[in-house]
Structures are given as C-alpha cells and as structure tokens.
C-alpha cells in the first residue's frame, strides 16, 4: 500500500447534482423546486417555528416555572460526600475548601443520600430530617 495509490471505495463518491442545466439532466427548468410558491423563489424561506401566520406551538403552550435568583448561593451536600471528608468538624468553610459547594455559596443543606458511619460535628448547616437522624445515629451532633 502506498499513499499515492490510495483511492476511495467504489461507489463512495458521487458527482454533485447540477440543477437547472437542461431537460436531459432531469433537474432542468424549475431545478427540482416545483412550480411557483414561496419555496420556489430566491430567498423564499420562513423562520424556524413559523406556521404560516397560525399561532405557533411555542406560543400556544403556557409558560412554566422560573429561574431562582438564589440558586447559586444555596448548596446541597450528600451524606456520602461527608463520609469522605477528612475533617470531623464540618462547616461551610470546610465544604468550600473540599470543593463540595461553590465559592459563592452562602448556606448549605445536608441531604440524606448515601451513608454516614463516622461521628461528625456539623456547624451552621441545615439538614433534612432524615439526614439529621442519620448523623445523630452515627454518633454525630449539630452545633449551631
């Protein structure tokens, strides 16, 4: 095999279809665009989602939900993540240093996902009822 002898597989390449070049080509006269109408004209296109003047689907459906402005300031931490932390006293600063919450986070809440088997002390963080129960069952406590 030599680089100057490489060829594409048979049938892999197709000549570009030339339109508007006579009856014999099969795509002469109207060049495959049919007769008249918006789509046959030069520049004849419509916006994506335009339904011919009918109220578009996107506007017929109701708006839902909103974007919370406080989302980036409130963090969630799993019990399983706390298990991996090397420190026993857990507060917002420890979570930021471990990269479990973002730098902009102003408050965090512990949720009961995963397992906690060691004793920890939680300072200044919220927790769900089940997360609080799991921490206390493992011998941990909450210091406000």
Swiss-Prot record:
Gene Ontology CC, one term: cytosolic large ribosomal subunit
Superkingdom of the source species: Bacteria
The keyword Ribosomal protein belongs to this UniProt entry's keyword annotation: yes
Keyword RNA-binding: yes
PROSITE patterns registered for this protein in UniProt: RIBOSOMAL_L15 (PS00475)
Disulphide-bonded residues: none
InterPro entries per UniProt: Ribosomal_uL15 (IPR030878), Ribosomal_uL15/eL18 (IPR021131), Ribosomal_uL15/eL18_sf (IPR036227), Ribosomal_uL15_bac-type (IPR005749), Ribosomal_uL15_CS (IPR001196)
GO molecular function, a single term: structural constituent of ribosome
Gene3D superfamilies: 3.100.10.10
Oligomeric and partner information: Part of the 50S ribosomal subunit.
Family: Belongs to the universal ribosomal protein uL15 family.
Name of the featured protein: Large ribosomal subunit protein uL15
């Amino acid at each position: 095999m030599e680089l100057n002898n490489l060829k594409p597989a048979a049938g892999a390449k197709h000549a570009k279809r030339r339109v508007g070049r006579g009856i014999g080509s099969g795509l002469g006269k109207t060049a495959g665009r049919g007769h008249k109408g918006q789509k046959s004209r030069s520049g004849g296109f419509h916006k994506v989602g335009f339904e011919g003047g009918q109220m578009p689907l996107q506007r017929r459906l109701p708006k839902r939900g909103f974007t919370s402005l406080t989302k980036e300031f409130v963090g969630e931490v799993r019990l399983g993540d706390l298990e991996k932390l090397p420190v026993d006293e857990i507060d917002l600063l420890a979570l930021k240093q471990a990269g479990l919450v973002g730098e902009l986070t102003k408050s965090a809440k512990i949720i009961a996902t995963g397992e906690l088997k060691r004793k920890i002390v939680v300072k200044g963080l919220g927790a769900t009822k089940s997360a609080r129960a799991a921490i206390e069952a493992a011998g941990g406590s909450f210091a406000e």
